Amino acid sequence: MKHNYKVKLFDELGFVRKKCKKCGQWFWTLDEERETCGDAPCDIYSFIGKPITKKPYTYKEMVKEFINFFKEHGHEPIKRAPVTARRWRDDILLTIASIAVFQPWITKGIVKPKANPLVIAQPCIRLNDIDNVGRTGRHLTCFTMGGHHAFNREDDFKYWQDETVELCFNFFKKLGIDEKSITFIESWWEGGGNAGPCYEVITHGVELATLVFMQYEKVGDNYKEIPLKIVDTGYGIERFVWASTGEPTIYDAIFKNIVNKLKEDAGVKDIDKEILAKITEVAGLMDVKDVGDLRKLREEVANKVNIPVEELDKLISPYEDIYAIVDHTRALAFMLGDGIVPSNVKDGYLVRMLIRKTLRHMDRLNLSTPITEIVAMQLNELKDLYPELLDMEDYIMEILEIETNKYRQTIERGKGIVERLLKSKKEIDLENLIELYDSHGLPPEIVKDVAKSLGKDVKIPDNFYTIVAERHENKKEVKEKIKLPEVNVDKTELLFYEYPKMKEFEAKILRIVDDYVILDRTAFYPEGGGQKADTGYIIKGDKKFRVVDVQKENNIVYHKIENLNDELKEGDIVKGVIDWKRRLSLMRNHTATHIINAAAQKVLGRHVWQAGSDVDVDKARLDITHYKRISREELKDIERVANEIVLNNYNIKSIFMDRNEAEEKFGFRIYQGGVVPGNVLRIVIIEDENGNIVDVQACGGTHCQNTGEVGFIKIIKTERVQDGVERLIYSSGLSALKAVQEMEDILEESAEILRCPTEELPKVIKRFFEEWKEQRKKIEELEKKIGELKKFELINKFETIGNYKVLVEKVEANPKEMLNIADNLATENAIVVLLNDKGNILCKRGENVDIKMNELIRYIAKGGGREHLAQGKYEGDVEEIKKKVIEFIKNK
């Protein structure tokens, strides 16, 4: 699409438009002699060893320099968002750019921005180049995107191309970057259905900023102008630091202290900086993703520094590991500090992958410094800019210790898994590697090592971790929705918010379609936010129609009627009656959900986040993120804190707030229940007598007006739903009393059976258990003796078939006793086949028998097992089985 890239600054300063003689891109420059666009691979990284700013900057200094510059130029600084984007979005897991903070609500024009124009320094996580980190000198998984953004409406236009380019140019100038070295490449950006022209801002071979002007929506192959025109800029803070120091790699510029510490610990010798610089320089001249196993990169560098490739490998490999470790641990500091709990799904999977990849790099170096210490160093470096991360240090350290132990156990257990797989497969392909990593946590390098010990080769793609990360980042949850008929009526007036205790109401029927009645107003709560729908009746005259379900879509509430007939007509005035006893239970349990969530955060830590809920009449469940099983003591503490909140009878208020105001005041923790659409949010607040927040959430559910109305809360049990997610099941009010009484009934019944007082149950049960174990031991000894006696009874019934002694016999024994008997008989070259009158069959062989018992049992009966022992079920008589056994052995 054609666009005019010429701006006021270019005219004023005499920029010229040129076409790059190497790549053919158009660009703007002050240097009339320049023939190339300035970007790699058309130009080399000429800043390495020759810093391009007036002074070297640290990461912290560059963040402050960036924020202060744009603040001085009329931009309001705003706080960073968490690196886990699913706190406010359901389409991506991680925050991948500064604009992601404002999507989708602000960029769609539904919500006004917190400030306009604004500036932000947003830490981001991108895993699409994870395999290149450490290898190329420039790739990072964790980086900070500086962004100055303007959201332009027709009636409130801030600035556009002229001002954006001028601001960027002046920022470069302020840093001391030579004006003639700066080029603005004309480009085009598309993403998320939007599009617009952009400039890539280059100096000395490296792109430092991108200036995007979002002004179109892409519809098929066409572009349509959008009313909200957005200035979306991205400045690479770490790249600015790198260019200001002239270090050979971006890692040496950002993580110098930690790199030096790890080099010392690993005993890695200093190598010529020219070698590191050449690797970075050559990597900048090629698309590393196309290099395959990076051999080409190695060969190019080896030629340039006159070192054999094998020697270069030995020199550079430890550096690549160190660089990957310092990058990954910075990412872990943010991911864990922002409350991500390692698990097998979503962002939990990605953080676990990063931990394990880091540990693998550390193992290759034989580092004595634990991962906890390296992340602690990162937290110390970040504490001035991000003090909130340091507040999570205890949690971060515990998580890392737990995950390290899990990783070590996985490696030990996994070797056997790989060996078994290789026995059944000729080779292990990419899908097998991914399955072993996803299901068993086995890094591909371990799989390769085990395979090598068995004489087999496994090929690992250089971009393995990128492939795995992309698969998990792109996984979408498909939630089943009730298909509702489309109707064209006004939105339904919701009475349950304004009048939360309304039990009856009058309304007019607007539409009747299928089994649904649509009213102009309703006090029936539609299913949503984890809370079940209200039920009750719609009454017309003396006729009652049962409401069995209520759903809401596009601001229209649908009332499903049981046995709907033509007595109800559109235009009728009817009365709605809520099943109030049911609603009251739902309200109590929903408020109890908020209370327990607050209690769990207080007892377990700020990493706790709601991962799902289901509010029903008799009980409710709350899924929370937590990295280990909740102990009995912790559970009692959660229950105690929850009931203290109830007894204190705290006020509960529900208010409608502007989205930005709510986020600014309460933070992203308001989205405990998931992503909430819209500009206006309903915020449910529980606060103590001093006005301190006990719990606050964006929630559309029905709630009590104070915590005392909830009544007694009883946590019935906990479950481990999946790794990293704990489920609490609980009841409130009379349902909680009923749950306690049911538990008491079980205790009383148990005490009656054991003929002891309930308070002595633990002691008596322990005694019975010890006695049972003793009796069990005696029974096993007797079974063993019976097996030995049976041996003498059956020893003379063996027949010789070829090289084997074979016994096929029916015995009076259960499967366990049959195994004892077979153990005594199946020695050396013996094959024992035992049957009983219950249809059980067992095949066992001696140590000198080559015939596989799992194959034998499949031939004579139905069953399975291992080569030396198999069990199953048979049909027919002993003679038929015996005939088949002999037939099978002779054929072998």
Swiss-Prot record:
Keywords: Aminoacyl-tRNA synthetase, ATP-binding, Cytoplasm, Ligase, Metal-binding, Nucleotide-binding, Protein biosynthesis, RNA-binding, tRNA-binding, Zinc. Its cofactor is Zn(2+). GO terms for biological process: alanyl-tRNA aminoacylation. It is an enzyme of class 6 (ligase). Binds 1 zinc ion per subunit. Its main location: cytoplasm. PROSITE patterns: AA_TRNA_LIGASE_II_ALA. It holds the Pfam family DHHA1. Its EC number is 6.1.1.7. GO terms for molecular function: alanine-tRNA ligase activity; aminoacyl-tRNA deacylase activity; ATP binding; tRNA binding; zinc ion binding. InterPro entries: aa-tRNA-synth_II/BPL/LPL, Ala-tRNA-lgiase_IIc, Ala-tRNA-ligase_IIc_anticod-bd, Ala-tRNA-synth_IIc_core, Ala-tRNA-synth_IIc_N, Ala-tRNA_lgiase_arc, Ala-tRNA_ligase, DHHA1_dom. Zn(2+) binds at residues 590, 594, 699, 703. GO terms for cellular component: cytoplasm. SUPFAM superfamilies: Class II aaRS and biotin synthetases, Putative anticodon-binding domain of alanyl-tRNA synthetase (AlaRS), ThrRS/AlaRS common domain, Translation proteins. It catalyses: tRNA(Ala) + L-alanine + ATP = L-alanyl-tRNA(Ala) + AMP + diphosphate. It is found in: Cytoplasm. Belongs to the class-II aminoacyl-tRNA synthetase family. NCBIfam families: A-tRNA_syn_arch, alaS. Consists of three domains; the N-terminal catalytic domain, the editing domain and the C-terminal C-Ala domain. The editing domain removes incorrectly charged amino acids, while the C-Ala domain, along with tRNA(Ala), serves as a bridge to cooperatively bring together the editing and aminoacylation centers thus stimulating deacylation of misacylated tRNAs. Catalyzes the attachment of alanine to tRNA(Ala) in a two-step reaction: alanine is first activated by ATP to form Ala-AMP and then transferred to the acceptor end of tRNA(Ala). Also functions in trans to edit the amino acid moiety from incorrectly charged Ser-tRNA(Ala), and maybe also from Gly-tRNA(Ala). This is Alanine--tRNA ligase. It comes from Methanocaldococcus jannaschii (strain ATCC 43067 / DSM 2661 / JAL-1 / JCM 10045 / NBRC 100440). The gene is alaS.
